[in-house]
Swiss-Prot record:
Residues 1-23 form the signal peptide. Its main location: secreted. It comes from Mus musculus (Mouse). This is Interleukin-31. The gene is Il31. One of its GO terms (molecular function) is cytokine receptor binding. Keywords: Cytokine, Glycoprotein, Immunity, Secreted, Signal. The keyword Cell division does not apply. Activates STAT3 and possibly STAT1 and STAT5 through the IL31 heterodimeric receptor composed of IL31RA and OSMR. May function in skin immunity. Enhances myeloid progenitor cell survival in vitro. Induces RETNLA and serum amyloid A protein expression in macrophages. GO terms for biological process: immune system process. Pfam families: IL31. The lineage of its organism: Eukaryota, Metazoa, Chordata, Craniata, Vertebrata.
Length: 163
């Protein structure tokens, strides 16, 4: 038998301990989430986006139509994920402010942040029209909620065709 002398054994023990520590702590440092958690989060986003849009369009923007000139990127998990998620989060934060917190987007923002591998970029979204006008604010909020809901529904359709 060949016996190794030196620091091999302590190094392996240290490596195993650090590897275990990193594996248990990595989720809090922005590591990718598991596929199960991702699937659950996407399902929650789909449902919440639809609920937010339906509630707002019925209760606060009845009879109004969305502004087609405002374009929100669709949700994706490809190379543009960080940028798309950052833009969506910025729009949803603006929705919360413009609706005077009557539209609570905090859960959606939290879920989007959780599935992003990096911290989302801080973006400033300009609102078309006069923000002092209630109508312009409502149209903006309705448009963002509708587009986000539609994007999540399209994601649902793509999921159903690939399964």
């Amino acid at each position: 038998m060949i016996f190794h002398t030196g620091t091999t054994k302590p190094t392996l023990v240290l490596l195993c301990c650090i590897g275990t520590w990193l594996a248990t702590c990595s989720l809090s440092f922005g590591a990718p989430i598991s596929k199960e958690d991702l699937r659950t989060t996407i399902d929650l986003l789909k449902q919440e986006s639809q609920d937010l849009y339906n509630n707002y369009s019925i209760k606060q923007a009845s009879g109004m139509s969305a502004d087609e000139s405002i374009q929100l990127p669709c949700f994706s998990l490809d190379r543009e994920a960080l940028t798309n998620i950052s833009v969506i989060i910025a729009h949803l934060e603006k929705v919360k402010v413009l609706s005077e917190n009557t539209v609570d987007t905090s859960w959606v923002i939290r879920w989007l942040t959780n599935i992003s591998c990096f911290n989302p970029l801080n973006l400033n979204i300009s609102v078309p029209g006069n923000t002092d006008e209630s109508y312009d604010c409502k149209v903006f909020v309705l448009t963002v909620l509708k587009q986000f809901s539609n994007c999540m529904a399209e994601l649902q359709a793509k999921d159903n065709t690939t399964c």
